[in-house]
Amino acid sequence: MNYTFQYGVVWKNFGELLDGAILTFQLGAVSFAGGALIGLFCAALISYAPFILRLPVHIYVVAVTNTPALIQIYFLYYGLPEFGIRWSSEACLLIGLILNAGAYLTMIMRAGFLSVRRTELEAGQVLGLSVVQQVRYIVVPHIAKSIYPAMANFFIVILVMGTSVGALIGVDELTGQAINLSSVNYRWLEYFTVIALMYVVLTFIASVGLALFGRWAFRVRARIF
């Protein structure tokens, strides 16, 4: 093998890779937060709403979870302009990831709702707790503790695999920056070796942060490692 690694080229452009890493984290965080809101709303509908309201949610979840995220984002980026709707590549990626995360988090949160036993609510009623107090002191802590590890793991999936799809539609997140820079000097191995390590660092930071937050807020350890 006559290939000579030249990481000096990567170091000269490391600032741009760092910008891509920051954008990656921002996209992952916003996508997860938006998806969590959708997931909470849809999980509540599936768990407690009548069939006529549950049906659209079921269709949404089945459609999204049974098609690749890339196809969904391509539809937003390439399909919507055919109908006169044009969004930036960043907007298409963000909306696509939010909708995708919302469907998966709906299933996770629904499992949390189903884990609350009727006897626990009845015990709250016997103690004289109002509906709001039952939700605050019984439902929310129980659900949060049961679903937090799964949600923490899903955030890592969004952060690494979800955001990197944006490189295929021109988003300059971490993978996109590496593709752009390596296409100039053709040092593909160097750039992608470095961003692989950067992804490891990103996920490590996120994992530690989520584990510490889980212990502090819910007294539960997110088993990520």
Roles of regions detected by a PLM:
Residues 1-225:
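Transmembrane alpha-helices and adjacent helix-loop boundaries
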